[in-house]
Amino acid sequence: MRHKVSGRRFDRPTGQRMSLYRNLVTDLLNYEEITISEPRAKEIRSMAEKMITLGKKGTLASRRRALAFVYMPGIVEKVFEDLSKRYAERPGGYTRMTKLGPRQGDGAEMVKLELIK
């Protein structure tokens, strides 16, 4: 029984799964909106919000933690310079999920995950 076991495995080894999360979070922070399946969106939503919260802290340690997670250093600059100012007054909830319906090929529920303007 898997009572109180959080997180999804997506039928991948840990390294591949973490790489998938890092790529999706990097894309979300870069393009500010992505269309993905609902379970994936639910997994990366909290990670993206944590990156923005690190940007709002603005310390050297938080910048290094963000650089360790996000693949492209330019995205970290964007988070610390632009997004941290945009969400300075907002205490959390930087993302929005909008349901788009099932995907044609396999019927997976698709959502648009976007950063709130």
UniProtKB/Swiss-Prot annotation:
Keywords: Ribonucleoprotein, Ribosomal protein. InterPro entries: Ribosomal_bL17, Ribosomal_bL17_sf. One of its GO terms (cellular component) is cytosolic large ribosomal subunit. It comes from the Bacteria. GO terms for molecular function: structural constituent of ribosome. SUPFAM superfamilies: Prokaryotic ribosomal protein L17 (SSF64263). GO terms for biological process: translation. Pfam families: Ribosomal_L17. Part of the 50S ribosomal subunit. Contacts protein L32. NCBIfam families: L17. PANTHER family: LARGE RIBOSOMAL SUBUNIT PROTEIN BL17M, RIBOSOMAL PROTEIN L17. Belongs to the bacterial ribosomal protein bL17 family. This is Large ribosomal subunit protein bL17. The lineage of its organism: Bacteria, Bacillati, Chloroflexota, Dehalococcoidia, Dehalococcoidales.
